[in-house]
């Protein structure tokens, strides 16, 4: 089971709860950094939990099984459980990301607007069991509605 993630309100519709977690390097909140004197970036504390450490290793394994892009560098893997994200840009990601979705579901394609303003018709990309590379900090994107169980993994860098 994935924990509720209350730090991403811009991604959800209405009062729904987003379940998922970021594993790897994460951004500390600016207030936390100055109050506690901690670094801007830190290794996710969840990795000390055996289950999350296993999820992180599985994410690395899955990426390595599906990719031919050996030069791509990521610092973080974002797990999303049954999440339909609304139209957004990734504010803290740097450069391109890879995304893949796994599970027993129908629908759930990634919608990407190639216009930086997010206008016009989106491109629909089937990411079920396939990695797709795109710049989520540059282009608006969202999840198509789906039925079933869907877990998406987003590989990105914050450095």
Describe each PLM feature range.
Residues 1-132, 137-159:
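Fe(II)/2-oxoglutarate oxygenase catalytic core
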């Amino acid at each position: 089971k994935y924990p509720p993630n209350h730090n991403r309100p811009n991604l959800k519709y209405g009062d729904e709860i987003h379940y998922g977690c970021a594993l790897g390097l994460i951004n500390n909140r600016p207030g936390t950094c100055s109050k506690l004197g901690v670094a801007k970036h830190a290794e996710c504390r969840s990795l000390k939990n055996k289950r999350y450490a296993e999820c992180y290793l599985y994410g690395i394994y899955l990426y390595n099984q599906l990719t031919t892009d050996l030069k791509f560098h990521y610092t973080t893997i974002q797990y999303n459980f049954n999440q339909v994200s609304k139209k957004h840009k990734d504010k803290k990601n740097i450069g391109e990301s890879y995304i893949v979705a796994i599970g027993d579901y129908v629908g759930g394609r990634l919608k990407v607007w190639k216009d930086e303003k997010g206008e016009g018709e989106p491109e629909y990309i089937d990411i079920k069991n396939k990695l797709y590379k795109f710049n989520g900090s540059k282009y608006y994107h969202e999840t198509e509605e789906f039925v079933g169980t869907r877990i998406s993994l987003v590989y990105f860098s914050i450095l």
